[in-house]
Swiss-Prot record:
GO terms for molecular function: bitter taste receptor activity; G protein-coupled receptor activity. InterPro entries: GPCR_Rhodpsn_7TM (IPR017452), TAS2R (IPR007960). This is Taste receptor type 2 member 9. The chain crosses the membrane at residues 10-32, 53-72, 87-109, 129-146, 180-202, 234-256, 261-283. It comes from the Eukaryota. It comes from Macaca mulatta. Signal peptide: none annotated. Glycans are attached at N163. Residues 33-52, 110-128, 203-233, 284-311 are cytoplasmic.
Length: 311
Protein backbone atom coordinates (compact mmCIF):
# COMPACT_ATOMS: atom_id res chain seq x y z
CA UNK A 1 0.00 0.00 0.00
CA UNK A 2 1.60 3.33 -1.08
CA UNK A 3 2.30 5.90 1.62
CA UNK A 4 0.76 9.39 1.57
CA UNK A 5 3.82 10.90 -0.14
CA UNK A 6 3.87 8.12 -2.72
CA UNK A 7 0.15 8.56 -3.39
CA UNK A 8 0.64 12.32 -3.90
CA UNK A 9 3.55 11.56 -6.24
CA UNK A 10 1.45 9.15 -8.31
CA UNK A 11 -1.42 11.66 -8.57
CA UNK A 12 0.88 14.54 -9.60
CA UNK A 13 2.83 12.48 -12.14
CA UNK A 14 -0.37 11.03 -13.61
CA UNK A 15 -1.86 14.53 -13.87
CA UNK A 16 1.24 16.02 -15.48
CA UNK A 17 1.52 13.07 -17.83
CA UNK A 18 -2.13 13.43 -18.90
CA UNK A 19 -1.79 17.19 -19.47
CA UNK A 20 1.52 16.83 -21.32
CA UNK A 21 0.42 14.02 -23.62
CA UNK A 22 -2.89 15.79 -24.30
CA UNK A 23 -1.15 19.10 -25.15
CA UNK A 24 1.54 17.57 -27.34
CA UNK A 25 -0.95 15.15 -28.89
CA UNK A 26 -3.17 18.12 -29.75
CA UNK A 27 -0.25 19.76 -31.58
CA UNK A 28 0.40 16.59 -33.59
CA UNK A 29 -3.29 16.01 -34.35
CA UNK A 30 -4.08 19.56 -35.52
CA UNK A 31 -1.00 19.80 -37.72
CA UNK A 32 -1.52 16.34 -39.23
CA UNK A 33 -5.19 17.08 -40.01
CA UNK A 34 -4.17 20.37 -41.63
CA UNK A 35 -1.46 18.49 -43.56
CA UNK A 36 -4.03 16.00 -44.91
CA UNK A 37 -6.48 18.79 -45.83
CA UNK A 38 -4.00 20.99 -47.67
CA UNK A 39 -1.83 18.13 -49.00
CA UNK A 40 1.10 20.25 -47.93
CA UNK A 41 3.02 20.90 -44.75
CA UNK A 42 4.91 24.01 -43.71
CA UNK A 43 8.34 24.05 -42.13
CA UNK A 44 7.03 25.25 -38.76
CA UNK A 45 4.50 22.39 -38.75
CA UNK A 46 7.28 19.83 -39.29
CA UNK A 47 9.24 21.31 -36.38
CA UNK A 48 6.21 21.33 -34.07
CA UNK A 49 5.19 17.77 -34.98
CA UNK A 50 8.73 16.49 -34.40
CA UNK A 51 9.01 18.37 -31.11
CA UNK A 52 5.61 17.19 -29.84
CA UNK A 53 6.32 13.53 -30.65
CA UNK A 54 9.70 13.68 -28.88
CA UNK A 55 8.01 15.32 -25.87
CA UNK A 56 5.39 12.55 -25.68
CA UNK A 57 8.18 9.95 -25.68
CA UNK A 58 10.09 11.89 -23.01
CA UNK A 59 7.03 12.16 -20.77
CA UNK A 60 6.32 8.45 -21.04
CA UNK A 61 9.93 7.48 -20.28
CA UNK A 62 10.24 9.81 -17.26
CA UNK A 63 6.95 8.60 -15.81
CA UNK A 64 7.73 4.94 -16.49
CA UNK A 65 11.12 5.32 -14.82
CA UNK A 66 9.52 6.94 -11.77
CA UNK A 67 6.87 4.25 -11.40
CA UNK A 68 9.49 1.51 -11.75
CA UNK A 69 11.62 3.00 -8.97
CA UNK A 70 8.62 3.63 -6.73
CA UNK A 71 6.53 0.50 -7.22
CA UNK A 72 9.05 -2.04 -8.52
CA UNK A 73 12.46 -1.08 -7.02
CA UNK A 74 14.09 -4.31 -8.17
CA UNK A 75 13.33 -3.68 -11.85
CA UNK A 76 16.74 -2.13 -12.56
CA UNK A 77 18.67 -4.95 -10.95
CA UNK A 78 19.17 -6.11 -14.54
CA UNK A 79 21.76 -3.87 -16.18
CA UNK A 80 20.34 -4.57 -19.65
CA UNK A 81 16.95 -3.04 -18.79
CA UNK A 82 18.60 -0.03 -17.17
CA UNK A 83 20.79 0.45 -20.24
CA UNK A 84 17.72 0.37 -22.50
CA UNK A 85 15.87 2.90 -20.32
CA UNK A 86 18.94 5.16 -20.23
CA UNK A 87 19.22 5.02 -24.01
CA UNK A 88 15.54 5.78 -24.64
CA UNK A 89 15.52 8.57 -22.04
CA UNK A 90 18.70 10.12 -23.48
CA UNK A 91 17.30 9.93 -27.02
CA UNK A 92 13.94 11.48 -26.08
CA UNK A 93 15.61 14.22 -24.02
CA UNK A 94 18.27 15.12 -26.60
CA UNK A 95 15.87 15.06 -29.55
CA UNK A 96 13.40 17.25 -27.62
CA UNK A 97 16.12 19.80 -26.84
CA UNK A 98 17.49 19.72 -30.39
CA UNK A 99 14.04 20.18 -31.95
CA UNK A 100 13.40 23.10 -29.59
CA UNK A 101 16.69 24.67 -30.68
CA UNK A 102 15.48 24.22 -34.29
CA UNK A 103 12.35 26.16 -33.36
CA UNK A 104 14.46 28.96 -31.85
CA UNK A 105 16.66 29.09 -34.95
CA UNK A 106 13.55 29.18 -37.15
CA UNK A 107 12.23 32.19 -35.21
CA UNK A 108 15.61 33.85 -35.56
CA UNK A 109 15.92 33.34 -39.32
CA UNK A 110 12.27 34.17 -40.01
CA UNK A 111 11.98 37.32 -37.92
CA UNK A 112 15.37 38.87 -37.14
CA UNK A 113 16.99 41.45 -39.39
CA UNK A 114 20.77 41.26 -39.10
CA UNK A 115 22.94 42.88 -41.75
CA UNK A 116 25.49 40.15 -42.28
CA UNK A 117 26.09 38.22 -45.53
CA UNK A 118 26.09 34.84 -43.79
CA UNK A 119 22.80 35.61 -42.04
CA UNK A 120 21.24 36.74 -45.33
CA UNK A 121 22.37 33.47 -46.91
CA UNK A 122 20.80 31.50 -44.06
CA UNK A 123 17.51 33.40 -44.46
CA UNK A 124 17.46 32.64 -48.18
CA UNK A 125 18.13 28.95 -47.52
CA UNK A 126 15.92 28.72 -44.43
CA UNK A 127 14.00 25.62 -45.54
CA UNK A 128 17.13 23.64 -46.38
CA UNK A 129 18.97 24.87 -43.27
CA UNK A 130 16.17 23.97 -40.84
CA UNK A 131 15.48 20.60 -42.48
CA UNK A 132 19.20 19.80 -42.33
CA UNK A 133 19.30 20.74 -38.64
CA UNK A 134 16.20 18.62 -37.95
CA UNK A 135 17.66 15.58 -39.68
CA UNK A 136 21.05 16.16 -38.09
CA UNK A 137 19.41 16.55 -34.67
CA UNK A 138 17.62 13.23 -35.05
CA UNK A 139 20.79 11.42 -36.15
CA UNK A 140 22.93 13.00 -33.41
CA UNK A 141 20.37 12.05 -30.76
CA UNK A 142 20.21 8.52 -32.15
CA UNK A 143 23.99 8.10 -32.20
CA UNK A 144 24.49 9.58 -28.74
CA UNK A 145 21.70 7.53 -27.20
CA UNK A 146 21.91 4.00 -28.56
CA UNK A 147 25.33 3.10 -30.05
CA UNK A 148 27.31 5.03 -27.40
CA UNK A 149 25.11 3.70 -24.61
CA UNK A 150 25.60 0.18 -25.94
CA UNK A 151 29.35 0.70 -26.25
CA UNK A 152 29.63 1.84 -22.65
CA UNK A 153 27.46 -1.02 -21.46
CA UNK A 154 29.58 -3.63 -23.24
CA UNK A 155 32.80 -1.99 -22.03
CA UNK A 156 31.84 -1.89 -18.37
CA UNK A 157 29.27 -4.66 -18.00
CA UNK A 158 31.70 -6.66 -15.84
CA UNK A 159 32.98 -3.87 -13.61
CA UNK A 160 29.83 -1.76 -13.51
CA UNK A 161 27.94 -2.53 -10.30
CA UNK A 162 24.78 -0.87 -9.17
CA UNK A 163 22.70 -0.96 -6.04
CA UNK A 164 19.13 0.36 -6.21
CA UNK A 165 17.08 0.26 -3.01
CA UNK A 166 14.37 2.30 -1.37
CA UNK A 167 17.09 4.42 0.25
CA UNK A 168 19.59 5.24 -2.49
CA UNK A 169 20.90 4.62 -5.98
CA UNK A 170 24.70 4.46 -6.48
CA UNK A 171 26.94 3.43 -9.37
CA UNK A 172 30.66 3.19 -10.07
CA UNK A 173 32.97 5.72 -11.73
CA UNK A 174 32.91 4.25 -15.28
CA UNK A 175 29.14 4.63 -15.33
CA UNK A 176 29.52 8.17 -14.02
CA UNK A 177 31.82 9.13 -16.87
CA UNK A 178 29.37 7.59 -19.34
CA UNK A 179 26.40 9.48 -17.97
CA UNK A 180 28.22 12.79 -17.82
CA UNK A 181 29.34 12.31 -21.43
CA UNK A 182 25.78 11.67 -22.56
CA UNK A 183 24.29 14.54 -20.53
CA UNK A 184 26.83 17.12 -21.69
CA UNK A 185 25.70 16.41 -25.25
CA UNK A 186 22.43 18.14 -24.38
CA UNK A 187 24.32 21.39 -23.67
CA UNK A 188 24.83 22.09 -27.40
CA UNK A 189 21.14 22.75 -28.22
CA UNK A 190 20.86 24.83 -25.04
CA UNK A 191 23.76 27.00 -26.22
CA UNK A 192 22.15 27.33 -29.67
CA UNK A 193 18.94 28.52 -28.01
CA UNK A 194 20.89 31.10 -26.00
CA UNK A 195 22.60 32.36 -29.16
CA UNK A 196 19.23 32.60 -30.95
CA UNK A 197 17.77 34.49 -28.01
CA UNK A 198 20.56 37.08 -27.86
CA UNK A 199 20.51 37.58 -31.64
CA UNK A 200 16.74 38.04 -31.56
CA UNK A 201 17.11 40.50 -28.70
CA UNK A 202 19.83 42.37 -30.62
CA UNK A 203 17.59 42.52 -33.69
CA UNK A 204 14.65 43.75 -31.60
CA UNK A 205 16.70 46.54 -29.97
CA UNK A 206 18.09 47.58 -33.34
CA UNK A 207 14.65 47.56 -34.95
CA UNK A 208 13.13 49.53 -32.05
CA UNK A 209 15.79 52.22 -32.40
CA UNK A 210 14.99 52.53 -36.10
CA UNK A 211 11.29 52.91 -35.30
CA UNK A 212 12.06 55.60 -32.70
CA UNK A 213 14.15 57.51 -35.23
CA UNK A 214 11.18 57.61 -37.58
CA UNK A 215 8.90 58.54 -34.64
CA UNK A 216 5.95 56.47 -35.87
CA UNK A 217 4.44 56.28 -32.37
CA UNK A 218 3.20 52.71 -32.68
CA UNK A 219 4.52 49.21 -33.04
CA UNK A 220 4.71 47.82 -36.55
CA UNK A 221 4.08 44.11 -37.36
CA UNK A 222 7.82 43.40 -37.38
CA UNK A 223 8.20 44.70 -33.83
CA UNK A 224 5.25 42.62 -32.67
CA UNK A 225 6.74 39.53 -34.31
CA UNK A 226 10.07 40.23 -32.60
CA UNK A 227 8.35 40.59 -29.23
CA UNK A 228 6.39 37.35 -29.61
CA UNK A 229 9.50 35.42 -30.64
CA UNK A 230 11.61 36.85 -27.80
CA UNK A 231 8.87 36.07 -25.25
CA UNK A 232 8.56 32.51 -26.56
CA UNK A 233 12.31 31.91 -26.33
CA UNK A 234 12.52 33.53 -22.86
CA UNK A 235 9.77 31.26 -21.51
CA UNK A 236 11.48 28.24 -23.04
CA UNK A 237 14.83 29.21 -21.49
CA UNK A 238 13.26 29.71 -18.05
CA UNK A 239 11.61 26.29 -18.23
CA UNK A 240 14.85 24.75 -19.47
CA UNK A 241 16.84 26.37 -16.64
CA UNK A 242 14.38 24.73 -14.24
CA UNK A 243 14.46 21.39 -16.06
CA UNK A 244 18.07 20.80 -17.05
CA UNK A 245 19.82 20.94 -13.62
CA UNK A 246 17.19 18.60 -12.16
CA UNK A 247 17.60 16.28 -15.13
CA UNK A 248 21.37 16.20 -14.57
CA UNK A 249 20.88 15.30 -10.92
CA UNK A 250 18.29 12.67 -11.78
CA UNK A 251 20.57 10.98 -14.30
CA UNK A 252 23.76 11.34 -12.23
CA UNK A 253 23.05 8.56 -9.77
CA UNK A 254 26.58 7.45 -10.58
CA UNK A 255 27.96 10.40 -8.59
CA UNK A 256 25.16 11.53 -6.29
CA UNK A 257 23.35 9.08 -4.00
CA UNK A 258 19.65 9.78 -4.41
CA UNK A 259 16.93 9.12 -1.89
CA UNK A 260 13.49 8.00 -2.97
CA UNK A 261 12.02 11.42 -2.11
CA UNK A 262 14.67 13.15 -4.26
CA UNK A 263 13.81 10.89 -7.18
CA UNK A 264 10.09 11.59 -6.82
CA UNK A 265 10.55 15.37 -6.61
CA UNK A 266 12.95 15.22 -9.56
CA UNK A 267 10.43 13.34 -11.68
CA UNK A 268 7.69 15.86 -10.86
CA UNK A 269 9.92 18.83 -11.78
CA UNK A 270 11.30 17.31 -15.00
CA UNK A 271 7.81 16.54 -16.30
CA UNK A 272 6.75 20.21 -15.88
CA UNK A 273 8.94 21.34 -18.81
CA UNK A 274 7.63 19.10 -21.63
CA UNK A 275 4.06 19.33 -20.30
CA UNK A 276 3.69 23.09 -19.84
CA UNK A 277 5.72 24.16 -22.87
CA UNK A 278 3.23 22.47 -25.21
CA UNK A 279 0.48 24.92 -24.16
CA UNK A 280 2.85 27.86 -24.62
CA UNK A 281 3.47 26.62 -28.17
CA UNK A 282 -0.29 26.27 -28.74
CA UNK A 283 -1.06 29.81 -27.59
CA UNK A 284 1.89 31.20 -29.55
CA UNK A 285 0.79 29.67 -32.87
CA UNK A 286 -2.23 31.23 -34.60
CA UNK A 287 -3.48 27.98 -36.17
CA UNK A 288 -3.10 25.94 -32.98
CA UNK A 289 -4.59 28.72 -30.87
CA UNK A 290 -7.63 28.99 -33.16
CA UNK A 291 -8.16 25.20 -33.06
CA UNK A 292 -7.78 25.19 -29.27
CA UNK A 293 -10.31 28.02 -28.79
CA UNK A 294 -12.70 26.32 -31.22
CA UNK A 295 -12.45 23.12 -29.18
CA UNK A 296 -13.12 25.04 -25.96
CA UNK A 297 -16.22 26.66 -27.49
CA UNK A 298 -17.44 23.24 -28.61
CA UNK A 299 -16.94 21.76 -25.14
CA UNK A 300 -18.62 24.76 -23.52
CA UNK A 301 -21.59 24.51 -25.87
CA UNK A 302 -21.84 20.76 -25.32
CA UNK A 303 -21.93 21.21 -21.55
CA UNK A 304 -24.61 23.91 -21.84
CA UNK A 305 -26.83 21.74 -24.05
CA UNK A 306 -26.43 18.75 -21.79
CA UNK A 307 -29.48 18.32 -19.59
CA UNK A 308 -28.92 17.46 -15.92
CA UNK A 309 -29.59 13.87 -15.03
CA UNK A 310 -32.73 13.42 -12.95
CA UNK A 311 -33.13 9.93 -11.41
Amino acid sequence: MPSTIEAIYIILIAGELTIGIWGNGFIVLVNCIDWLKRRDVSLIDIILISLAISRICLLCVISLDGFFILLFPGTYDTNVLESIMDAVWTFANNSSLWFTSCLSIFYLLKIANISHPFFFWLKLKINKVILAILLGSFLISLIISFPINGMWYNLFKVSHEENITWAFKVSTIPGAFKQLTLNLGAMVPFILCLISFFLLLFSLVRHTKQIQLHATGFRDPSTEAHMRAVKAVIIFLLLLILYYPVFLVMTSSTLIPQGKLVLMIGDIVTVIFPSSHSFILIMGNSKLRAAFLKMLRFVKGFLRRRKPFVP
